[in-house]
Every structure is written in C-alpha cells, then in structure tokens.
Amino acid sequence: MAEFDFAEEINSEYLEEEYLTDAMTGGQDKRRQLYYQLIQSMKKAESVDIIVSFLMEAGVKMILQELENTLKRGARIRILTGNYLGITQPSALYLIKRKLGDRVDLRFYSEKGRSFHPKSYIFHYTDHSEMYIGSSNISRSALTTGIEWNYRFSSKKDPENYERFFQTFEDLFENHSIIIDDKELKRYSRNWHRPAVTKDLDKYDIADQETEDTKIKPLYEPRGAQIEALYALEDTRAEGAKKALIHAATGIGKTYLAAFDSKPYKRVLFVAHREEILRQAAVSFRNVRNSEDYGFFTGDEKSTDKSVIFASVATLGKSEYLNEQYFAPDYFEYVVIDEFHHAVNNQYRKIVDYFHPQFLLGLTATPERMDGKNIYEICDYNVPYEISLKDGINKGMLVPFHYYGIYDDTDYTKLHVVKGKYVEKELNETYIGNVRRYDLIYKY
C-alpha cells in the first residue's frame, strides 16, 4: 500500500515579515511552528547546515522540495544526523539520496562513546548567518504542531555564541562523522529494526497529518520499503539493467511500487493471472498517475490504445494476440509481471519473450519454486532489492502474526488421479462438502 499524504499549500499570510518570529513553541498557530520559519530562511540562504539527532520520513517529505530549490540556486547543504538506537529511518535517508543525490553532504555522527542530541538549523547569507537551536528533530510533528521550543538568533547580534556553536558543528561534521554513501546506507537499512520509541513518533506524525487544516490536495507517495526499492531500481537502471526482480513480502506494496517506478513511462503493461488482481492494480496505478487513461486486455475486453494496459495471462498469452495486429514487440516501454514465480510457465514465458520493453519488472513474494525451476535467469539474475516477511515485521512495515497448525481430516483416498494430479472437479466437491473444515477455519 502507498502512503496517502498531502501536498501542502502554505498560505502566504504566514510568510509576511510581520509574522516572522525568533521564538517558536509549536502548537496549532502556524506562526509559532518551526517549519514555516525554516522555509522562509531556506528561500534566502546561500548555504544550509543541519544537525539533528534523527530524521523521520514524514519530516523529510515536508522540507525535501525546498531543499531541492535551495540546491538549484547553487547553495551548499550539509546534514549531520545520528544512527543511535536506529531512530533515524532508512526511508528518510533514501528519500534524500533519491531526490537530491550527492548534491547534499549527508553524514552520520560516528562516535559511539558520546550521546548525540543536538537540534540546530543554520542558514548562511551574504553578510551574516542565523541559527535555530532548540528541541526539534526532523519529524512532521516536531516541525509543526508538537510542543517544541526553538529559538533563532543572528551572528550579528550574538557573534560570540554563534561562533561557538558553529565551530562545534564544523568539528563534529569534519572530524566525527562518516559519509552516508550507498554502501553505508544499505548496511544501515539491512540492520535496521524499528525501535519501540518510533511507534510513538510515527503516531504523532500521523495524528498531525490527520488534523491538518491548511489547504490540501490528495497525494499518493511511496513509503518505507517502497522508497528503498525505488532507489535500488533507479540505481540498477543507471548501471544499464533492462530487467529486475523485486522480492518483497505480501503487504509491502509491490503493486504501488510498480506504479511509482513506471510513472515516467508512457506505455505500460501490467500482467497478472487473475482479473481480480488486474482490477486492484488498476486502482493503484490510477491513484499514482492521477489518470483514467488505462484499459484491460482480458476475455471480455481488448483495449489496445490506452497508456496503461492490464492484461490477463490467459488472454494475452494466446498466439492470436501476441502479434503486430494487437501489439508490436516494442509497443510497451515498461512491462510488469506480477507473481513472477509463475514466469517459467508456458503462457507467461510467451509474453516475456515476445515483448522488448525498455524495462521489465518482476514482482514476487515467493521466488523459490517447489519444482526447482529457475525464475532468476528470466530477469538476468538481477534482484536489486528484497525484503522478507521477517524483515518487514522487524522494520514495522508488517504486523506480527501467529501460525496455527490445525489438522485437516479431509479424505483424499477416494479421489481419482489423472497424470499425477487430482481431478479438479472431484477435489472442489470434496472441499466444498467438508463442513467440518469450514468450522475449523472460522474457529481459529
């Protein structure tokens, strides 16, 4: 599932000079929220330095666009954050790397023997600098409605104390930090488990979002593992890859991931084995693309002129449709194969072999097959990102659950076997007729 977020339109009255303040205390009055003051300072700054204990995904999303605007003006941005206890979310770091790349000097505080709890935002102008210092890390609630105390002062008014703070930042950044490059980010993400304290932080951010009273418009954005996977997919394409397999547990949001990743492409094909999946996928793509320009290629519908086509394997895999009369091999720029572990089957393979898109994405939660057939060769053994069920639970993206092993007394001995398989009609009747089986399922 994708995150349903909001694109915020800041009312210009809050940005007038008379509403600027040096003391920010949070709460519902936007004039007392740190976020609106930071945006004003960022719009004028020639360089920006940020030092905070942790970064949260929701907070980064709020300031990301203004950070990019600042970079476009030629400004320098440095960010120093902590990794202690794993409060900094990997997705927050991936957001920065994906959107801003190496234009931002992003680092972890590296000393393990000292605590790291600073929260300061420093803006440098032509003839002076100003510093915000207080209690706000980069989370949505801390930047807006949370009770956070922050104070702004200028290097002109208090040069001695400004210099003391700034030189401390310089020392920490240059001598007590490690650069967050791709290798370090992957290492941090791989080892990251969602700490209990972030459950409250996430709760505050969500509550703040739900009570938002600014002018808003609905927006679907990637979240969590989707952000990490998108970064990995963009990286693998930059290296020249034409195919990739994403192995992600059910519930991570693979369909939305495909919708986000394929958004820049004009003609997209989404293939699945059940029409129900196609209909659900269409909703995801419509939300992400904000477009009704999509159609279906199934037993009852044969759309060929839409930007996004959702096709059933059973229909598209027929020879009568895999030809120039319906679709040229290079018609689709981007092809998604859902349930990619089925791709070794005949009809799936016909589709995969026929089309030659700019990029092919396979999605699966279960890459291993009981028959030993290899699905990895179909995607050139390229798996840029994977997240298991266990990892999804540990990272707080999926809920934990309990397995129940329940004895099923269904009697298969009277069923006929043809070519190594039970007769499907008899099997269905046996299951449907076993009322005790239903009782067991409902009981547990």
Map each language-model feature to its residues.
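Pre-Walker A adenine-sensing motif
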Residues: 226-238
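Walker B catalytic acidic pair
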Residues: 338-339
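Conserved helix-turn-beta segment of the N-terminal RecA-like "Helicase ATP-binding" lobe
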Residues: 268, 276-301
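Conserved interdomain linker/interface between the two RecA-like ATPase lobes of SF2 helicase motors
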Residues: 383-444
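PLD/PLD-like phosphodiesterase catalytic module centered on the HKD motif
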Residues: 1-223, 227
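Conserved helix/coil segment N-terminal to the catalytic DExD/H
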Residues: 299-331, 345-350
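Post-DEXD/H (motif II) to motif III coupling segment of the RecA-like Helicase ATP-binding lobe
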Residues: 342-403
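Walker A/P-loop
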Residues: 238-261
